[in-house]
Amino acid sequence: VRLGLDLLPHCDWIVIHDGARPCLDELILWRGLDAAQHTGAAIPVIPISDTLKQISDQHLVSATVDRNSFWATQTPQVFRREILVRAHQQITHHVTDDSGMLELLGYQVRVFDGETTNLKVTTPPDLKIAEELLRARAI
């Protein structure tokens, strides 16, 4: 992303999308652009449906975590350009996504509804599900 920002022509908004999420619906983009108007940064989230367990170094369950306060993050993430550029200039250590850099700098990141169909393809079963979703959309 950092290198892409240097090459991108001037614009007010940056939308970052993970290429491993091929089933993006256009409505998510519009929701993101709308949500980002409030704080300059917005990310799609979906509720976590699985039970979450905290595991010790000894591979034992040490706690069951209340999943109601946790959400899974997706892309596209939407940012006002100047905020994202500033974050990339000031944060040089690894973070898992661009919104994490803004959080470290004290920016508020607004959330909006993602979609379970906007899945991340990381395993062969994920690929089969994505293929079926895309095939169904083409009908």
Feature roles, as predicted:
Residues 11-21:
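Short beta-strand-to-loop acidic/aromatic patch adjacent to the donor-nucleotide binding site
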Residues 23-112, 139:
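Conserved core of the sugar-phosphate nucleotidyltransferase
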Residues 20, 92, 116-119:
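Glycine-rich "substrate-gating" loop/helix at the edge of Rossmann-like oxidoreductase active sites
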Residues 2-13:
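Active-site nucleotide-sugar/metal-binding loop of Leloir-type enzymes
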Residues 4, 17-18, 47, 80, ...:
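Residue-level signal for inorganic ion chemistry
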Residues 1-2, 26-29, 124:
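Conserved strand-to-helix beginnings and helix N-cap segments that scaffold or border functional pockets
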Residues 118-139:
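Hydrophobic helical membrane-anchoring modules
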Residues 6, 34, 132-136:
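Short, well-ordered alpha-helices that flank and scaffold nucleotide-derived cofactor binding pockets
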